[in-house]
Every structure is written in C-alpha cells, then in structure tokens.
Amino acid sequence: MQIVLFTKLFLGQPIEEVGAVASTLGFDGIDLLVRPGFHVDPSQPEAITAVVHRLGEDGLRVPMATTDLTDPAAIDTPRLFNTFAENGIRLVRLGYWKYIQSVGYAPLLETARRQLEELASLAEAAGITLAIQLHGGTIHGSGAQAAALLQGHDPRVIGVYPDPGNQTVQDGREDWRFTFDILEPWINTVGVKNGGWFPSTNAVSGQRRWHSDWLGLADGMVPWDDIVGHLVSTDFDGVLTLHSHYEVPYPQVIDQTRLDLNYIRRLIAESGASQ
C-alpha cells in the first residue's frame, strides 16, 4: 500500500510547501488536486510536469490525481489524460455525478453511464485507470450505488474509491464490510479520514437536529483498525489517500496530519505482524 497526501489542505500554499510538509511527515507520495485555484488548473495540464518534477525533488511520487471531471466534453480530456500518463500519474479520480431529486435517479444514472463509457475509452487510450469516489450528495454515495455504475466496466480501466469517512459523515452509510465486499473487484484506492455526529439544537417542530465534524483517525466513528486489518489480510496493494479536512489553523492541521499518518502506519504494521 502507498500512503499519499491529498493536496486540498494546501490551498494558497506554494508547491514547495507541499513537498516539504509531505516529505517531512513521511508520506510516500501525493494525491494531486487538479482544480481551478489549486496547483494545477485542468485547462492547463502542461503545469503538471513542473509540479511532478518539483515534488520529485523532495522524494515524493505522484501516483494519483484528483479531478472534478464527469463530462469528457467539458475540457480537452484526451490532452489531460495523456499529460497524466506522460508524468507517471496512472490513477485519476473522477468528479461527482450529483443526485438531483427534480431530475430523478434513472435519467441521472443513464447520463453517468454514457459519460463513463466515453471516459473509459479515453482512459484506456492514454493508459491510465480511473476511480469513482464514494461521496455524499451523489448517485455513488454507497457501495451499492457505485456498483450500479461500475457493472460491466473493466477494473483495469475504471475502479472505485471507497471512503468510509464520507459514508459516515455525509450519506451512503452501510456496513463497511458490505462496501468492500460488493466493490471488491474494482477497489484501487481508499480515502482515509474520520468523523462523527453530535446532537445540536431542536427545530421549531421539536425534532432534534444533528451536526457532523471531521475528527482524527483514531477518534471518529470509522473503525480504521478493523478496515486496515481487512486491507492487510486481503493483500490490498492500491493507494491510501489521506484527507486532512480539519477546519482549524493550518499549523494545527499539519500536526493532526502527522498523528493520522503515524496512526495508520502503526495499524498497518500491527495488522501485518498478526498475520
């Protein structure tokens, strides 16, 4: 397993800071966010080369990138995919097919399947693999929902990215064992974060409201000790991408990220020793 750091937490920071922090903390590499306002804009894929080179100076690989891409016609997708491949980025997360109640699930699924077919053809031509992340507010928030999208797709071209933290704090909640079971042929990435729910105030109706928040990996509702044990016992050799979405001052985010990485590495070591 490779453990990489998702670069969303570095909004506004130079790429030199990304490399310095990730290498000092001990990450294997980077999950590069390709999004307007971040280090690479999807309309300017030529910037990828310089970013990958700079991170390499800190001893970091860039095995994967995260995009918002769902419609292959929205940008020059072949150019973007080919640039990823040329720079050794072989795993690319797609964007979100959002659930819109007024449209309805069936037409949304039909559109997503059509776009996925086009994306799969482009990915195969470029020699990269795509990943669909489980995420709230989408038609792929749970394992069961994602499986409906993935049926018929070659896992070497399109895979899936379970994210137990999203499933806990957002929607798509289901037994994590079921998630990993139903998606097993396609899993190439696992999102690593944790969170929980807390009682809030009552609505006028008297109904109790609840709110969620991100928590350290050892402190939330996701049983990472069990999940890591499962990944080790099944010889998972994909990517673990660690997300630090904490809404605290930047130095504190880095401190918590250090704790999270050390925790996940300890779980891997202990699970391996027990095999």
Residue ranges and their predicted role:
Residues L25, E86-N87, P185, T234:
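Structural motif
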Residues Q252-A273:
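C-terminal helical cap(s) of enzyme catalytic domains, especially alpha/beta-barrels
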Residues M1-I15:
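Boundary/entry segment of secreted carbohydrate-active catalytic domains
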Residues D31-V52, Q101-G104:
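Glycine-rich, proline-tolerant flexible connector loops at the mouths of alpha/beta enzymes
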Residues G19, S121-M221, V228, G272-S274:
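Acidic/histidine-rich catalytic cores of soluble enzymes
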Residues I3-T7, I30-L32, V62-T67, V92-L94, ...:
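Hydrophobic faces of well-ordered beta-strands that scaffold small-molecule active sites
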Residues L9-L11, V34-P36, D68-D71, Y96-I100, ...:
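Active-site-proximal loop/turn and secondary-structure-junction residues that shape catalytic pockets
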Residues E16-G19, R54-R61, T70-P162, V169:
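Active-site acidic/histidine proton-transfer and metal-coordination neighborhood
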